[in-house]
């Protein structure tokens, strides 16, 4: 069902989610292995990985699956989906984006018998760089979006697996709306010994949006800005493109090995 409107607060239905959880030992599990086991059975899953295993507060990784609601902003068009299969699609005032997101989050209530010091529910997703125009009074030159992704995209997930690397334990959560908990089925999947692996190979040649000479020229321009005191730091970027066949999660695995970061993420949006 599709509802088209321009009103901001036309619907405030509240969705009550019943929370179930199970704590398990995770000394033989890793975020990558868990993700590989669940991704074929639960499409549109996401991985948020921490490689900081030494700090208790920051040593959590998250795997989210089973999206039951979502919010997406593309241009000035807002799309929302809900657990009861309803859908809203309408134009928004760019100055009201924060209110729209806040309203969306308030439409969900969880019945948690226990509180946790780490994230176990809420919105998971991203806010792109160009979305700054919704939060700050700043003009951004409109450019073609070659990657064709929404400026803002978040989802509410039924299942969240939180891994505490510091204590070698994991929590499996199920936030259920009018359905039974699937924790035991999920536990069985992530403790299986096997998971599917797929090939990956590159095709064609590597291309870039800048030549070596153009990139070096930009560096010289940046040096002058720094010397004049216009800025104290600038980070230059250069985009490379490479065709491929197969499983792009292998790229994520390679990058986390070649150039590890304290925090990494892999989002599957289909």
Specify the residue positions occupied by each region the protein language model found.
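Extended alpha-helical targeting/anchoring segments
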Residues: 7, 11-270
């Amino acid at each position: 069902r599709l509802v088209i409107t321009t009103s901001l607060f036309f619907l405030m239905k509240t969705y009550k989610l019943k929370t179930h959880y199970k704590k398990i030992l995770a000394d033989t599990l890793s975020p990558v292995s868990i993700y590989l086991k669940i991704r074929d059975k639960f499409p549109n899953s996401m991985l948020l990985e921490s490689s900081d295993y030494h700090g208790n507060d920051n040593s959590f990784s998250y795997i989210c699956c089973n999206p039951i609601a979502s919010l997406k902003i593309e241009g000035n068009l807002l799309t929302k989906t809900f657990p009861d299969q309803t859908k809203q699609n309408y134009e928004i005032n760019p100055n009201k984006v924060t209110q729209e997101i806040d309203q969306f989050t308030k439409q969900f209530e969880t019945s948690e018998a226990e509180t946790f010091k780490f994230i176990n529910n809420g919105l998971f997703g991203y806010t792109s760089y160009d979305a700054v125009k919704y939060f700050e009074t700043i003009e951004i030159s409109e450019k073609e979006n070659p990657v064709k992704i929404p400026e803002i995209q978040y989802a509410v997930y039924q299942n969240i697996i939180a891994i505490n690397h510091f204590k070698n334990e994991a929590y499996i959560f199920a936030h259920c709306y009018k359905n039974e908990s699937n924790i035991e089925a999920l536990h069985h999947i992530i403790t299986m010994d096997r998971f599917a692996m797929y090939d990956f190979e590159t095709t064609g040649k590597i291309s870039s949006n800048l030549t070596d000479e153009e990139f070096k020229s930009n560096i010289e321009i940046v040096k002058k800005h720094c010397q004049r005191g216009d800025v104290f730091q600038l980070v230059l970027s250069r985009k490379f493109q490479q065709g491929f066949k197969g499983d792009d999660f292998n790229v994520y695995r390679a990058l986390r090995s070649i150039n590890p970061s304290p925090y990494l993420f892999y989002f599957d949006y289909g």
